[in-house]
Amino acid sequence: MAVPKKRKSKSRANSQNHVWKREIVKQARRAVSLAKALLGGNTNFLLVSPGPTTPIKPNPKKQTGRRPRSQRRRT
């Protein structure tokens, strides 16, 4: 018979939500700061690498690690 999961305490849930929201706010501040720097022309501190000089080729078909049936050893 199925048993319901034990509920988390409200204080623990609030604590975890606070940590997640704090990380989101930190990332948002960094994004806004970078956008202001790029739009304002203050790019002396940014290291921007140029794009790749050669075109990127698509990866060949991934090998699954198994040989085709015709090439397998027979035991």
Swiss-Prot record:
Compartments where located: Plastid, Chloroplast
UniProt-recorded Gene Ontology molecular function terms: structural constituent of ribosome
Renumbered residue ranges of the record's region Disordered: 49-75
One GO cellular component term: chloroplast
Biased composition (Basic residues): 59-75
Keywords in alphabetical order: Chloroplast, Plastid, Ribonucleoprotein, Ribosomal protein
Primary localisation category: plastid
Annotated GO biological process: translation
HAMAP family (alphabetical): Ribosomal_bL32
Protein family membership: Belongs to the bacterial ribosomal protein bL32 family.
Stated name of the protein: Large ribosomal subunit protein bL32c
Originating organism: Nephroselmis olivacea
